[in-house]
Amino acid sequence: MLPLDRRRSFCINLRMRFCFIAPCLVLFALFSWAKIRDPFTNPFDNPVDDPDLPRVLIIGDSISIGYTPRVRKLLQDKANVHRPSTNCRWSAFGKENIDEWIGESKWDLIHFNFGLWDWYGWEQEQKATPASYAKNLDGIVRKLKKTQARLAFAVTTPPCLGPERKAKIVVSEARANEFNKAAIQVMINHGVFRNDLYSLVVKNRVKYQRGENDVHYTEEGRELLAKQVADFIGKVLNK
């Protein structure tokens, strides 16, 4: 057993170390929380609303997940930009879940897309057709219109040049255009604004996509998409 004076010294040193370490741990925890909770880096971290700004909802797959934080940054002090805390996947999945994503909140503008999952058939037992895709989109738009928000459809970004890494198939430009034409007709029928992201990048896929087997975008590609989305949202809000 340690002598009394050494035990006292040990306890004092222990308390001093704790008093030094504890604030550091608190600061580290706060810094980590703040980093994780940054809406400009985390797409699923929706901002605390400024009541003086319009509310915007972005609905879409991983392409929109990639550009959402950048859109928030570009529209900072202009709009409260939200999105569902999930990948919104394909059109039939969207039709089933759209009410949950809209929620009970008031939206001034909803910018939405479904497409790539329908083209490639990821996680789907039944292969989509332009007709089934259009039918699902029509159902989605009818539900969105009930919010009385302005609606903007993002025309689906292009397929990758080679066999997609998961589906192992090539989606031709002809197939992509069939689906996009079907979507555009639905939007025309309902008077929905259209943001043509397809034309923005189709001729520069080698530059902006991650690879010939990947539909996703490099940082430069995400910045390009985000700028067009932010500009488009700003224009529609000002109409």
Please give the residue ranges for each predicted region.
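Serine-esterase "nucleophile elbow" of acetyl-processing enzymes
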Residues: 34-106, 110
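Alpha-helical cap/lid subdomain in secreted, periplasmic
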Residues: 49, 74-80, 93-239
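Extracellular interaction modules
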Residues: 21
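Bacterial Sec-dependent signal peptides at the C-terminal "C-region" and cleavage site
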Residues: 18, 27-40
